[in-house]
A protein has these predicted regions:
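Bacterial N-terminal signal peptides that target proteins for export
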Residues: 2-14
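Flexible, solvent-exposed loop/hinge segments and secondary-structure transition points
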Residues: 26-157, 161-165, 169-188
Length: 188
């Protein structure tokens, strides 16, 4: 006798079904912490001062007029400093890929231009190519005046269209928020 019984076949079917229905979060990978990303983006910084930006109704309308959905009136920013001088800003954000959250950080210089983008956690089963340095480097030097649109100044990655689009939209939102805060004196 082979040892294969109707009961064991039921277990195989149950396990196969459970694996097929397992959430895509099983693919989650954490690459960097927010602190590690900040130090990577601004290695010369001797301090990262946490700041909360709080926008009023008029400022939120300005963000919407700039074509971004602010999602919140409050933003957490780490101000990178060396000897009291501001080097730039680090903002950590989450966007939905296809089904799961993507956590990323954007380093922005004191001039308002993107210095670096790092993916901190990626939870999708596909589209992890957005972590490739070549794709992330496309954002370097872009500021609030850049279109920041997939298919225009940002290349798409086949199989990662939603991840590319949503991270790009998030970065556009962040550079616009930082631009507004810089010009309002909120980061001085």
């Amino acid at each position: 006798m082979s040892g294969f019984t109707p009961a064991s076949s039921s277990v195989v079917v149950t396990l196969t079904t459970a694996l097929a229905l397992a959430p895509t979060a099983a693919f989650a990978v954490d690459y960097l912490s927010a602190d590690e990303a900040a130090k990577l983006m601004f290695p010369q910084a001797d301090r990262f001062e946490p700041r909360t930006l709080a926008f009023d109704a008029e400022q939120l309308q300005r963000l919407q007029a700039a074509g971004v959905s602010p999602r919140s009136a409050r933003w957490q920013v780490r101000v990178a400093q060396r000897d009291g001088a501001t080097l730039g800003y680090v903002v950590v954000d989450d966007v939905i890929g296809k089904f799961e959250l993507i956590t990323y950080a954007v380093g922005i210089g004191s001039d308002g231009a993107v210095r670096q983008v790092e993916v901190l956690s990626y939870r999708e089963s596909h589209g992890h190519e957005i972590r490739l340095p070549a794709w992330r480097r496309q954002f370097v030097g872009k500021d609030a005046s850049a279109p920041l649109r997939v298919g225009e100044d940002i290349a798409n990655i086949s199989g990662a269209t939603l991840s590319c689009s949503h991270v790009t939209e998030g970065i556009k939102r962040i550079v616009t928020v930082i631009d507004l805060a810089r010009h309002a004196g909120s980061l001085a």
